[in-house]
Amino acid sequence: MRPDDINPRTGLVVALVSVFLVFGFMFTVSGMKGETLGNIPLLAIGPAICLPGIAAIALARKTEGCTKWPENELLWVRKLPCFRKPKDKEVVELLRTPSDLESGKGSSDELAKKAGLRGKPSLQGQGELPMASSITTPTPMEEGECQSPGQSGRREETSRYLDGYCPSGSSLTYSALDAKCSAWDRSEHPEPEDSIFFVPQDSIIVCSYKQNSPYDRYCCYINQSQGRWDHETIV
């Protein structure tokens, strides 16, 4: 913005319209004296030339050089159907999902529908579907207390397969839908700082923590339904 508070684009509009303003003012003054152009009085021609130029300058001032819509004026134009932008309901729901998860609003079924997990079966013997709003990497003590006995077979097979790639004692595996500890268990063990959001359903999380590693820590997500346990390398 210039020191005189005039947008350069607005100044360009004034320069282009100044010709119409000058001739419109001259015709208006001549028409007030009774002069005519043939049978047409100049008093009718002058305002017809001058008023559009004044309107163009006013519009350029309101829109900051025709770069944006005015804030308070021309509200009726925005309400026209041609100016309305359709909003995708799915995008709106996905945008609202993180705030709902952080604030705790909405039931587990509603959050499952928003995350696209409505058609997948839930675990047996659990009243609610635990969402991955605050799934954290457990310590070895928490892992022993929060294990689900119904998935021992698949877990043991996966653990044996991963033993060849991860040193013993450096990896922790658990399902994303395991039951969490109760309230009195959480008070004894503080929650880790890092949290993982929207973990895929029925997936295995492998986290490695090495003291001398330059990469500090990393986690891998493995889908049990899509994994083949013959000749694969998991990075």
Swiss-Prot record:
Stretches the record annotates as Disordered: 99-158
Organism encoding this protein: Bos taurus
Domain of life of the organism encoding this protein: Eukaryota
UniProt xrefs under InterPro entries: TMEM215
Its membrane topology: Multi-pass membrane protein
Membrane-spanning parts: 12-32, 40-60
Chief localization: membrane
Keyword vocabulary terms for this entry: Membrane, Transmembrane, Transmembrane helix
One Pfam family here: TMEM215
Gene Ontology cellular component annotations, sorted alphabetically: membrane
Protein name (database record): Transmembrane protein 215
Subcellular localization(s) per the UniProt record: Membrane
